From Swiss-Prot:
Transcription inhibitory protein for the torCAD operon. Also acts as an excisionase and plays an essential role in the defective prophage CPS53 excision. Belongs to the phage AlpA excisionase family. The keyword Transcription regulation applies. One of its GO terms (molecular function) is sequence-specific DNA binding. The keyword DNA-binding applies. The lineage of its organism: Bacteria, Pseudomonadati, Pseudomonadota, Gammaproteobacteria, Enterobacterales. One of its GO terms (biological process) is negative regulation of DNA-templated transcription initiation. This is Response regulator inhibitor for tor operon. Interacts with TorR. Binds to the effector domain of TorR. This interaction, which does not interfere with TorR DNA binding activity, probably prevents the recruitment of RNA polymerase to the torCAD promoter. Binds to DNA. The gene is torI.
Amino acid sequence: MQHELQPDSLVDLKFIMADTGFGKTFIYDRIKSGDLPKAKVIHGRARWLYRDHCEFKNKLLSRANG
């Protein structure tokens, strides 16, 4: 059985990179520009809300579709 992600699920940088196909530099540049919120640091680990990742991905797709 595979776990289904909820809007408040936490995802890491590896997940975001795998899901978008972009590398660390691209992702961190998007954080600097404000397109992706900064990660929440929880017990020394950087995590994003799945909801924030989805919004970020939708922004990328809408820009690509013009």
